[in-house]
Amino acid sequence: MIRNSDYNSFVCCAVCNKIIPPAPFGKTFKRIHEYKPLKTRFYTHKDILDIGANILKKEEKFQEDILRERIAKAEAEVWAQANERQKQAVEKALEEANDRHKIEIQILKEEHQKDLQEVTAKTKTEMYQNMDDEMKREHLAAEQRMVHRIQRIMMECHREKVEAVEKARAEERLIAQKAIQAQKSKATEEIVNTGITVTKDEKTSVARLMREKEHEMNVLYGIAQRQKQEEVQEVLQEAEKTHQATLGNVMDTLANTQGELLSIAKQLGIMTNWKDFLEEELQETRMAFQKYINYTFPKLSPGHADFILPERKKTPSNLVIEENKTTLD
């Protein structure tokens, strides 16, 4: 608003060049103030300045909103770029860490493989030595059992042979005694039945007859004894053949048993080798997995990953006792 030179009236603006009288005061102003129309008829200089100020404030607020929106958008773009770069940096760092981790794992794996090969070679040597010692002990024990069994069979044969000889001799004695008694009875009956008077010649003939009978009885006894000896010899030969056949069967059975023991020992060695190989592979897998867990999750408490690859259960005590009993047998 432009003030006139008389300082009493005002020009609205340079466009309309409308002269506005000064604002009323005193009673007139009070009446207008009490009346309070919806729209006043004129504006004062202060009102126009306030309207302009409001317009300027709205424009400034609008510009500030636009600027704030642009700043927020730029800030969001900057944060997005920062997050993307951070993500790329993290991925790159993870890739580098993964590469280093793979290299370290490969180095550890090679070292572990070398150690495992050395331990495997040493274990195989010890195992073969133990198996050789065990086989020698088994062979020695089998030979001792075989010798003991053969000695027992030979003692059994000798005892049966002695019993058969004693029995044959007793039977021979009994038969000889019976034959002598029969011959004596027969001679006595012949002498009694003859009824010849006892004279010197008769005594001589009786004595001669007795000598002849005794010689005949001795000859018969010798023949019977030879026959009995031949029969006993045949029985002994049959018993010897039977015992030899039994001994041969026992030897064949022992040889077959020894072959079966060797086959079982060989199978046991193969199974032991497989068991040791599987145990080593399982232990190697467990150690590699534990190293991977330690490198990947260093803050993980011990034992939290055991559910993935748990420790093997111990062999039951009864199985250990049974295996020991089998080895002793």
UniProtKB/Swiss-Prot annotation:
<protein>
    <recommendedName>
        <fullName>Uncharacterized protein C6orf163 homolog</fullName>
    </recommendedName>
</protein>
<feature type="coiled-coil region">
    <location>
        <begin position="224"/>
        <end position="250"/>
    </location>
</feature>
<feature type="coiled-coil region">
    <location>
        <begin position="57"/>
        <end position="119"/>
    </location>
</feature>
<keyword id="KW-0175">Coiled coil</keyword>
<dbReference type="InterPro" id="IPR038927">
    <property type="entry name" value="C6orf163"/>
</dbReference>
